A protein has these predicted regions:
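Helix-loop junctions and short alpha-helical segments
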Residues: 48-49, 60-145
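Extended alpha-helical coiled-coil scaffold domains characteristic of the BAR superfamily
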Residues: 51-55
Length: 145
């Protein structure tokens, strides 16, 4: 069964394809004016495609975090990198009782960390995506291309 992230990406990709169809139609209709006159469609398609990919990546990361928290019952079963990421976040907390809050509901804490980190993503650059997969799922850069 496809994930919600994939379904959303497919829907957005259909919109990109419609922009491409419009571009091709306008190019045929106004062939004398050249591609420069359709620059706005090219930019719109590219921006929409990039933002769709960013939303897809964010959704995949969040869905993966949710999947992990449904399957794992103890934080010690998380990948080492995820444990380090959580530990670093707890240490940086200004609230002195954060370790207790983490202990009470580590799954929610883990999901919130993922949520806040993906909201900071802003651009789907490879190194940023790889870092998120490494930090939360223990998947190294070599495993993602």
């Amino acid at each position: 069964m496809p994930s919600k992230a994939y379904k959303t990406f497919q829907k957005n990709l259909n919109q990109v394809n419609k922009l491409i169809e419009t571009y091709n139609h306008e190019l045929e209709r106004n062939s004398g004016r050249g591609k420069k006159s359709l620059d706005h469609l090219t930019r719109a398609g590219l921006i929409f495609l990039c933002s769709s990919f960013e939303v897809y990546v964010e959704s995949v990361i969040y869905e993966t975090g949710n999947f992990i928290t449904r399957k794992i019952y103890q934080p010690k079963k998380l990948p080492m990198e995820a444990k380090k990421t959580i530990s670093d976040a707890v240490k940086k907390e200004k609230n002195d009782i954060s370790p207790i809050l983490f202990y009470d509901d580590w799954k929610e804490y883990y999901r919130k960390l993922i949520y806040y980190d993906i909201k900071k993503l802003n651009t789907p650059k490879v190194q940023n995506i790889q870092q998120l997969f490494k930090n939360y799922f223990g998947i190294s850069e070599n495993e993602i291309d």
